[in-house]
């Protein structure tokens, strides 16, 4: 079990992590931007450290600032919460390189699961049930139409690289599939 963790996030998720850590008797370090200095998560944590200006790209997404904060406060692990750096394999790797545990999936798992086509293939290989769909990348609208005819409508059309729900379209009927495919492919 960790003695101290740094929460690389803000707001409600940071508050929840702090409360859970407190129940486990784990000390917490909150990070904050200059805009969030008096935010609730900074007040609830055992320690709080500024990681940069209000702009998220210069604070909550600044890997070097967050790792420096963890080293300075002697945190043993970093909990990313969700969003920000939570799915950043480079961040997870850098945590490992400086001897700080990343609380979440490994960088390798993030890389595998970040590509939807590869993720689906890995799930099938591991015998995890998956919903009917393509067996790989769909290159043309005609190929998408053939797959949709086989499995039936409605279908969900997903851009393989889209994350967080981006690039996903529900298609109710064949006549809408071509335009949805073109949108997802652009």
Where are these regions (language model features)?
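N-terminal beta-alpha lobe that positions the nucleotide/phosphoryl donor
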Residues: 1-186
């Amino acid at each position: 079990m960790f003695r101290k963790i740094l929460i690389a996030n803000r707001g409600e998720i940071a508050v929840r992590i702090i409360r859970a850590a407190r129940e486990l008797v784990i000390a917490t370090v909150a990070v904050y931007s200059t805009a969030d200095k008096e935010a609730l998560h900074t007040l609830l944590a055992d320690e709080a450290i500024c990681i940069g200006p209000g702009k998220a790209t210069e604070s909550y997404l600044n890997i070097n600032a967050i790792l420096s904060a963890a080293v300075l406060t002697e945190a043993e692990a970093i909990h990313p919460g969700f969003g920000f750096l939570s799915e950043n394999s480079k961040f997870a790797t850098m945590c490992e390189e400086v001897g700080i545990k990343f609380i979440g999936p490994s960088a390798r798992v993030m890389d595998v699961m970040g590509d939807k086509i590869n993720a689906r293939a890995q799930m099938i290989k591991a015998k995890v049930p998956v919903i009917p769909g393509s067996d790989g990348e769909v290159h043309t609208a005609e190929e998408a139409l053939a797959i949709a005819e086989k499995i039936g409508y409605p279908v969900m059309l997903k851009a393989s690289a889209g994350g967080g729900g981006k690039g996903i379209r529900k298609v109710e009927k064949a006549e809408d599939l071509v335009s949805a495919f073109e949108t997802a492919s652009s």
